[in-house]
């Protein structure tokens, strides 16, 4: 029983991370993915500024992809948040 309680407490303490495309949150391109061609350094820097672990330029999608962002981060692009073409 003590082990079960310990496991439950440990799961509550562990922070859940998620991966996804970085999103522009202001200006003319608000709601769009942050685009790139081959600039891994820019994507990595921007990812880390937003609380992620590692970012890179996903060449086939021409967008910055970030790994290890907090799940509650508003910087993760989703279809629901896509206001790029409006």
Swiss-Prot record:
Gene3D superfamilies: Knottin, scorpion toxin-like. GO terms for biological process: defense response. Disulfide bonds join 32-84, 36-57, 43-64, 47-66. It comes from the Eukaryota. Residues 19-85 form the LCN-type CS-alpha/beta domain. Keywords: Disulfide bond, Ion channel impairing toxin, Neurotoxin, Secreted, Signal, Toxin, Voltage-gated sodium channel impairing toxin. One of its GO terms (cellular component) is extracellular region. The keyword Signal applies. It is found in: Secreted. Expressed by the venom gland. InterPro entries: LCN-type_CS_alpha_beta_dom, Scorpion_toxin-like, Scorpion_toxin-like_sf, Scorpion_toxinL, Scorpion_toxinL/defensin. It holds the Pfam family Toxin_3. Coiled coil: none annotated. The keyword Signal applies. Its main location: secreted. GO terms for molecular function: sodium channel inhibitor activity; toxin activity. Residues 1-18 form the signal peptide. Has the structural arrangement of an alpha-helix connected to antiparallel beta-sheets by disulfide bonds (CS-alpha/beta). Belongs to the long (4 C-C) scorpion toxin superfamily. Sodium channel inhibitor family. Beta subfamily. Binds voltage-independently at site-4 of sodium channels (Nav) and shift the voltage of activation toward more negative potentials thereby affecting sodium channel activation and promoting spontaneous and repetitive firing. This is Neurotoxin LmNaTx34.2.
């Amino acid at each position: 029983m003590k082990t079960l309680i310990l496991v439950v407490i440990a799961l509550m303490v562990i922070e859940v991370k998620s991966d996804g495309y970085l999103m522009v949150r202001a200006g003319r391109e608000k709601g769009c993915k942050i685009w790139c061609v081959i600039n891994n350094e820019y994507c990595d820097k921007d990812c880390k500024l937003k609380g992620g672990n590692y970012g890179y330029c996903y060449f086939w999608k021409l967008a910055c992809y970030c790994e290890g962002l907090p799940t509650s981060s508003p910087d993760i692009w989703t279809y629901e948040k896509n206001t790029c073409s409006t």
